[in-house]
A protein has these predicted regions:
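Short glycine-/small-residue motifs
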Residues: 120-123
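Conserved active-site tyrosine of GNAT-family acetyltransferases
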Residues: 20-25, 91, 118
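Vicinal oxygen chelate
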Residues: 1-9, 31-80, 88-114, 125-132
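Catalytic core of Fe(II)/2-oxoglutarate
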Residues: 13
């Protein structure tokens, strides 16, 4: 293996690379690194690189058993936000589609939104550290 870098990469299968790029750049402040649409593009936010692979990309080719990679599911990237209520309000006003409402647990608050292909993005606001 190569040495780890500062950048972390995650691949998402998408139905439409251009729609996916528009979603991540418009709603979540990612920046385009490269685009070979309609097959592939990659976008970045901080040290997260998201590889967006369409049906015509090499990552979209069927496996030897015939299984085709598909978008969607429940695996997701997890983005930390400072004020989840304000972020959700901003995104709802902009038309971002959410799967649920804000949930709160001992670790903090979270909500799920989805990109145009159904891939999930989790927004998470950590709980305040307990006072000792």
């Amino acid at each position: 293996m190569t040495e780890p870098s500062e950048m972390v990469s995650v691949r998402y299968m998408v139905d439409d690379v251009e729609k996916a790029v528009a979603f991540y750049t418009s709603f979540l402040d990612f920046k385009v690194l490269t685009s070979f649409a309609p097959a592939f593009a990659d976008v970045a936010r901080g040290n997260l690189r998201l590889l967006l692979s369409g049906p015509t990309s090499s990552a979209g080719r069927p496996m030897p058993d015939g299984t085709k990679p598909r978008p969607g599911g429940w695996n997701r990237i997890h983005l930390i936000v400072d004020d989840i209520d304000a972020e959700v309000s901003r995104l709802r006003d902009a038309g971002a589609p959410f799967r649920n409402d804000i949930l709160e647990g001992p670790g903090g608050k979270q909500i799920l939104l989805q990109d145009p292909s159904g891939n999930v993005v989790e927004l998470f606001q950590p709980a305040a550290a307990p006072v000792r």
